[in-house]
Every structure is written in structure tokens, then in C-alpha cells.
Amino acid sequence: MSQIPFTVSARTAKLIGQENFSNAEGAIIELVKNTYDADSQYCFILFENIGTLNATIYIIDFGCGMNDTTIQNCWMTIGTDDKLFNIKSDNGRIKTGAKGIGRFALNRLGNYTTMYTVPEKSDIGYKWTVDWSYFDKPGITVSDIYASINNIDPKDVKSKIYHLIEEKKIIKEIPPFQNGTVLEITQLNDVWDIEAIKSLSANLEILVPPFNTEEFSIFLYSPFTDLKGKINKSESDDYDYKISSSYKADKDQTLIINITRNELVTSALEQEYKELFKYETMQKYPYT
């Protein structure tokens, strides 16, 4: 009895990824999560030339970067189990990104991607490029599609990052760059108008740690005056119940849940407005 292998069409692999990112906003949020997983303290999202054929999205982090082995064995492997078994980053963060399909978020955003990355303690950087339109060709399997990778000087990546961030003036002092990644997405699939970027900005707030910490900061730049600068954490005191949870990822897989009540306390109202309730009109319905 002979055995034959399964094959996966390139289009099917692409569709699996797209099902997880039904809109462009979700795709960007996924890529921001990846910067957090890379132990970056900063994430920069830059929109350039919006409304033109040269529209570009940049996502920049100062994380651990990737070497050529990681690019080939993890980044280039669809559905990799790396985050399934390595649930914590080197700095102890619980990884939040999708398990092995996050790179398809790039395809959701645009047809062409260039990645510049510098791994930790390395004097070599890497430039990775892919044309996602190849995934739409009929009769093509995943193994028929190639991305290109070349060695680059880390100084060139540093120069590119500083140029992109400095000219936008969204941060007073650019953090020192030793390692990290730049994602450059072109031939965009969506129109990024003011409403789209405003919605993105609002949803990015939930990714900012809720406490007064500089552990992870997100910066956004767009051509719209009110939509540039540091993303602040989402704050709301208008709630009845607030649930917070923390997952320790220990051998017992401990999950801690805290519930805070903020309900209307009628006794406090009666005390605060006790003089009001003494009025004759407040003694009988309809209280007017």
C-alpha cells in the first residue's frame, strides 16, 4: 500500500488566515500584539501617503527581532506551534498573538510586505520580502511560493527607524535601538480615512496596560491632526461590575479573577439628598 501526502493550495492557506482577520483594524491589532510578544517596550504605527497609490503602513518595534533560523522555522511556518509551547516571552510576558497565522495579518492589510529585523546581540540584520498576490494564482500550492531574504547592516535598519520616527515628531526622545523589527506594508487593501483611524486608535487603547506603567507604550502617527501621538489607556468609571483576571502560566495553570462592584448604593443617596426627600412634593407620587 502506497502513501501519499496532503497538499495545501496557496489560496486555502491565505483564506484560513483571512478568516481570523475579517477587517484591517483587527489585522493591525494582531501585529501590535506581536510586538508585545517580542518584549518591545514601544510600538510605533505610522500611516504615510494615505489616499495615494503610495500609501504605506509601518509597524515598528524595539523587541527581540528575528534571525534567519527563526524567520524560516517560525515566521515562514503557517500554523507554527511555537507560541503554543512557548507561552511566555524571554522577559516573562504572556504571549498574546495568534498561534502561527499572524503573518497573514500583513496580507490582510496590503499586497506587498517588506520586513527589516535585527536580532538581539547580532551584527547582522535581515530584509524579508513577499508578494502576497502569488497566493491567488490558480494551481499554486504553498510550497510553490517563496519569500526572499537578504542580509543587511543593522545600522541601515536603525537609520530607517530613526528617520521614520523623528520626522513624525510623535515622541520627544527616540529610544536607543539595538534590536527590533520594521514592517513596511504597501499596495494597501483598504481606505484609511479619519473615521477608520479614529476607530483604530480607540481600539488600541485596550492593548495599553491598565496600570501606571511604562512596560508597553503605543504611538500612532496619521495625517490627521487629532490622531497622532501616544495612545492612552482606556479609562471608564461608569460601570456596575468590573472583572479583572491574571493568568500565572504556572504548572497549575492558575487563573485569578477579581470582581469589583460599583453599583448604585441607595442608602448613600438617601443620606446625601436627605433634605430633598423632606419636601412635601417628594412625599407623594409623582414627586414633582
Which stretches of residues belong to each language-model region?
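N-terminal assembly/transducer modules of large multi-domain enzymes
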Residues: V142, A147-T288
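GHKL (Bergerat-fold) ATPase N-terminal catalytic module, capturing the glycine-rich phosphate-binding loop
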Residues: M1-I185, I194
